């Protein structure tokens, strides 16, 4: 068997070949993902698969291990995937994001007024849509930065392989000021993404969603939005139900790949999280993939690539959960995932959960 790694537009393809045929494979998608306001380079793993007749022989594990080695060599800071239960923890991945759904009854959404014009999104709108998304998500952890010059549009709806279509809201000068992304299916009315910032935009988008739900003859519509999203807050006036799911060792999972590079890139975010009256403290951290020490020099937060024995100890999975705001330092301590050598140490926490 031969392992091949091929650079593709936007990422990598890794295949295990036998007799000239791919028998196990995956893709790595290049992305820039925010931790707070700071982008880090991530590899999104997708399409992990082995031919049915050859499963349970460790082939997928070989491909996954090759992917992690490649990402470390190529300077990726972290990696994320949507995992099946009880498999990807073997490669250091941990569940680190919740899954959100907001549901509104169609009859209530019909009360929203149309204040702006709407039309189907066009390729010429992609630059503006990317800019709206980046503006709306500027401090939202786990959102991906979209390059307005290169972003090619929405690859899918609310899930992998789900077809999609987008509508845009226009102001009085016919400029795109908001958008909504639908699952392009007839079985449900699902909204995968919403962009925009004014009440007029939100009214218009909800009106458009209600029209689609009526056309599909669905009693309710659902949105893939966290409860603190501005549009989710707007929808409270119409009555809605929020559902948040936390998977066990499955679902949205991630891991750090290059610890020091990642921490260096997010120093401005860690400085933002650090309480002003704690700046005299030094934060030393020891993990299974490396150590680091954070300290203030004047008004600047610095990192050293080592840590003394007297340090906070946690593995990279727990650190991933902490950086993404999935768990707090206190919850990690309670679960024996974080050992703190001295009681007054305070780890900066994510305020953007």
Predicted regions and their residues:
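Conserved donor-binding loop and adjoining core beta-sheet/short helix segment
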Residues: 1-57, 160-202
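Low-complexity, glycine/alanine/valine/leucine- and proline-rich hydrophobic stretches
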Residues: 275-334, 339
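Conserved small/polar residues in nucleotide/adenosyl-binding loops
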Residues: 343-349
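Active-site-adjacent scaffolding segments
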Residues: 21-25, 29-133, 137
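Non-catalytic peripheral regions of nucleotide-handling enzymes
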Residues: 229-272, 279-283, 287-296
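Amide-forming acyltransferase catalytic core, primarily the GNAT-like/NAT-type
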Residues: 99-195, 199-226, 252, 256-277, ...
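Acyl-donor binding region in acyl/amide transferases
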Residues: 50-77, 83, 185-250, 331
């Amino acid at each position: 068997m031969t392992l091949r790694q091929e650079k593709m537009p936007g990422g990598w393809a890794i295949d295990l070949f036998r007799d000239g045929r791919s028998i196990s494979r995956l893709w790595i998608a290049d992305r820039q993902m925010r931790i707070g306001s700071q982008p880090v380079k991530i590899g999104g793993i997708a399409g992990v698969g082995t031919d049915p007749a050859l499963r349970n022989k460790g082939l997928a594990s070989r491909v996954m291990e090759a992917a992690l080695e490649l990402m470390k060599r190529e300077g990726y800071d972290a990696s994320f995937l949507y995992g099946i239960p009880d498999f990807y923890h073997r490669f250091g991945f941990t569940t680190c994001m919740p899954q959100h759904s907001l549901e509104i009854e169609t009859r209530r959404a019909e009360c929203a007024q149309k204040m702006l014009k709407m039309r189907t999104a066009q390729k010429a709108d992609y630059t503006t849509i990317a800019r709206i998304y980046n503006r709306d998500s500027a401090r939202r952890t786990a959102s991906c930065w979209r390059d307005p010059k290169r972003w090619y549009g929405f690859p899918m709806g609310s899930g992998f392989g789900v077809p999609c279509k987008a509508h845009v809201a226009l102001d009085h000068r016919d400029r795109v000021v908001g958008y909504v992304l639908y699952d392009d299916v007839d079985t449900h009315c699902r909204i995968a993404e919403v962009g925009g910032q004014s009440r007029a935009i939100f009214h218009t988008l909800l009106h458009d969603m209600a029209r689609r739900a009526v056309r599909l003859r669905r009693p309710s519509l659902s949105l893939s939005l966290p409860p603190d999203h501005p549009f989710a807050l707007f929808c409270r006036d119409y009555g809605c139900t929020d559902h948040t799911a936390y998977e066990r060792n499955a679902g949205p999972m991630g891991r750090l790949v290059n610890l020091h590079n990642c921490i260096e890139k997010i120093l401005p975010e860690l400085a933002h999280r650090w309480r002003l009256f704690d700046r005299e403290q030094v934060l030393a951290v020891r993990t299974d993939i490396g150590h680091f020490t954070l300290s203030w020099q004047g008004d600047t937060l610095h990192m050293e690539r080592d840590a003394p024995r007297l340090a906070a100890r946690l593995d990279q999975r727990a650190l991933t959960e902490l950086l993404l705001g999935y768990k707090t330092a206190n919850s990690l301590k309670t679960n024996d995932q974080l050992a703190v050598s001295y009681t007054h140490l305070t780890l900066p926490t994510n305020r953007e959960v």
